[in-house]
Amino acid sequence: MEIVGCRAEDSSCPFRPPAMLFHGISGGHIQGIMEEMERRSKSEARLAKGAQLNGRDAGMPPLSPEKPALCAGCGGKIADRYYLLAVDKQWHLRCLKCCECKLALESELTCFAKDGSIYCKEDYYRRFSVQRCARCHLGISASEMVMRARDSVYHLSCFTCSTCNKTLTTGDHFGMKDSLVYCRAHFETLLQGEYPPQLSYTELAAKSGGLALPYFNGTGTVQKGRPRKRKSPALGVDIVNYNSGCNENEADHLDRDQQPYPPSQKTKRMRTSFKHHQLRTMKSYFAINHNPDAKDLKQLAQKTGLTKRVLQVWFQNARAKFRRNLLRQENGGVDKADGTSLPAPPSADSGALSPPGTATTLTDLTNPSITVVTAVTSNMDSHESASPSQTTLTNLF
């Protein structure tokens, strides 16, 4: 789009002032004024011829009184001295506008044409861009490198942690929650509900020495021997500590650090207690399956009101205690101090999946033909799941 040419004019000045215009002015002054006007008209004629020659060199024929051009916008004749050339068409200065927002494009650097219509840059990207960045919401051209996560596409510079703005590259672990991207450290703290907003990524790295948090893939781990208290190797704080007791008369507790950041401040531990119906549900399922999968954990979370993470660690500790009891029985020892025992796993030749004494079974609501092997009592209350919604931890390849 450019301003091209002007109308061709005769070298002589077409303006001739009437004699009455100079009434009352002496003859010498009138002659000087006329000479000055003729000199200016000749200089303007030379400039017009130069612009006309430039128009021919650029491939645009100059406008002439004999064959005036038609405006592609309004369809009228172009009688102005200057006009616009865009998409091989001629336009009045006032007629080149965006067909969507009616923005005048005479002073814009670029304009876009699609199916005979003229668009400004914003409207063209909004309507015809193939994909838009999920972070900055700007269009992504076909030649750009992008990062993909789920169904979203990002510019390379926009694929950063929503909390600390750390750039994520290929091979980095990241998490997504509600279409927001988080680095591994902030996603773990987000899941635990213990993130202090005043700390940035650089401050966390300086205090922790690398942010080498363990990766939890959502499945219970199998340990040999007595389970130990797990700690983060980089942060030096407890992740989760669970009591392994399963007594119905006494509520079990989950010990967890309420605020792992900053390490210099001491805070009281938050204790989460199990209720009797929660213990009964978990123990009855443990009698059937020692290692529940994600689908079973979801069903248990809905029935007990506990999070998947809490259920995972409870089953992990229950498996460890069950193995200790087996070792004691093999060695001929009897655990007299512990008055409770976990139910034994079902034998391979047993035909029933549910233990005796249970009234109903927990079924999968999404597929009625599949029965989840979780046995509950008839007076069990249903609870909503307290686990975070739409959260995943993804490894970017």
UniProtKB/Swiss-Prot annotation:
CDD domains: homeodomain, LIM1_Lhx2, LIM2_Lhx2_Lhx9. InterPro entries: HD, Homeobox_CS, Homeodomain-like_sf, LIM_Homeobox_TF, Znf_LIM. Residues 267-326 bind DNA. GO terms for cellular component: nucleus. Keywords: DNA-binding, Homeobox, LIM domain, Metal-binding, Nucleus, Repeat, Zinc. This is LIM/homeobox protein Lhx9. Interacts with LDB1 and LDB2. Pfam families: Homeodomain, LIM. It comes from Bos taurus. GO terms for molecular function: DNA-binding transcription factor activity, RNA polymerase II-specific; metal ion binding; RNA polymerase II transcription regulatory region sequence-specific DNA binding. It is found in: Nucleus. Involved in gonadal development.
